[in-house]
């Protein structure tokens, strides 16, 4: 961790993949520091046209939805609320810097806190 999954309409994502990966990584480094750079994992999921729905209707211009997997301890220690606010702001700024300001207002960032001992890598609890 941190692991970020960005779901973005394919029409917005196409051609912007490297820049978005870089910007999201830099957003995490901005908040945590340089030590976190090699730990940042970004998955980009391009959603094809007709496969994103809002209010029961398909849309092709939805704003990105970011899921940010983070250790629970990062949010429960002193200053955790400030860390959460900084992460949400930095990730939103990163999206807007690559996909344009029109994406900012609707971009959602969900911080998913994982308790210690509740995730693993390579078959081992991490």
Where are the predicted features?
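A domain-level signal for the structural core that forms small-molecule/cofactor-binding pockets
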Residues: 1-126
């Amino acid at each position: 961790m941190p692991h970020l999954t960005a779901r973005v309409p394919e029409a917005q994502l196409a051609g912007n993949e490297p820049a978005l990966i870089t910007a999201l990584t830099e957003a995490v480094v901005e908040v945590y520091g340089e030590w976190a750079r090699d730990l940042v994992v970004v998955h980009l999921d391009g959603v094809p046209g007709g496969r994103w729905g809002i209010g029961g209707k398909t849309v092709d211009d939805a704003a990105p939805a970011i899921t940010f997997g983070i250790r629970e301890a990062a949010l429960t220690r002193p200053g955790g609320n400030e860390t959460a606010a900084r992460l949400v702001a930095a990730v939103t700024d990163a999206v807007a810097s690559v996909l344009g300001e029109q994406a900012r207002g609707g971009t959602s960032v969900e911080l998913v806190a994982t308790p210690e001992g509740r995730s693993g890598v390579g078959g081992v609890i991490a």
